[in-house]
Swiss-Prot record:
GO cellular component, one term: nucleus
Residue ranges occupied by any ELK domain in the UniProt entry: 207-227
SUPFAM superfamilies with a match to the protein in the record: Homeodomain-like
Function according to Swiss-Prot or TrEMBL: Probable transcription factor that may be involved in shoot formation during embryogenesis.
Cellular localization per UniProt: Nucleus
Name of the protein: Homeobox protein knotted-1-like 8
Composition skew (Low complexity), residue ranges: 1-17
Originating species: Oryza sativa subsp. japonica (Rice)
Region (Disordered): 1-72, 121-148, 187-207
Family of the protein in this entry: Belongs to the TALE/KNOX homeobox family.
Amino acid sequence: MESFASLAGGGSSSTTARLPELISPENPDHISPPPLLYQLLAGPESSARQHGHDGHHHGGGGGEAAAAAVQGQVSPAGAEAAVKAEIMSHPQYSALLAAYLGCKKVGAPPDVLTKLTAVPAAQQLDEADGHPRRRHEPQRDDDPDQLDQFMDAYCSMLTRYREELERPILEAAEFFSRVETQLDSLAESNCEGTGSSEEEQDPSDKQLKHQLLRKYGGSLGDLRQVFSKRTKKGKLPKEARQKLLHWWELHYKWPYPSEMEKMTLAQTTGLDQKQINNWFINQRKRHWKPTPVAGTAFPTMEAAGGGFRHSGHGGGLAAAAALPLYMGRPFVVDGMYRLGS
């Protein structure tokens, strides 16, 4: 058959796209020659075959064909032009053209898609120039509703054909969309827990961070100071231990600080009195062992305000008075303080 594009373009020969041949509605109960509309749209070969078939049944029909020509019957070429004119002037021609162009747009490249989109605009301009699409009364002896049935049938056929063409494309697009979603979820799960740099932060996040720092900066500083004072595994800060050791070296003969000295050490080291007391107790137990003279009782004192505990039979007060005489200067062994003569 001739392509429907020739109808869309007013019979232009530049369009080469073709659709399947037009098939008349199925009627298995009554077999008759196809109507003139379907014969003409099926192509000149079909029309010629039909006319030859009619001529064969009429006994060659040479004289009758001449008589028909004399009587003014329309030739096949003239009938085809008349059918095209009726189709293009039918009210549903725009819908038929849109359905056909919809089939051509499926999977078309961008340049072809642009050209196909411009076709309805050209048809509207044609109508604005004085060629409106209006219904012509049939000038033939065919059924008046035949053209309406033809337009409805082929609009529905082209719509179904376009849906069949779009189905694999839509399925492929849905498949790729699912794959993309899965890849995005995998990428997001791999990136969880990784911190972003200052340059990658959102401006709103930076502004919120600055506001929180201005509001809670003082409290954060206090918390940082408190956490810095906390010791790990009972170890005091290095600076505090150095200050305590300096006091220890200065008072190695009697390493028992008074309450006032403890308060002063607490202020200078940043420790509390409990930590200072514990440090001096451990330091005296580990590194302060005065050597007693043979035959002389030596008292020991467990705390600054504690009483004396005597060993031997000597006088405790006399031994306590002579206590500094048995203490020499300290010396270091393996980093630990020792007292000797």
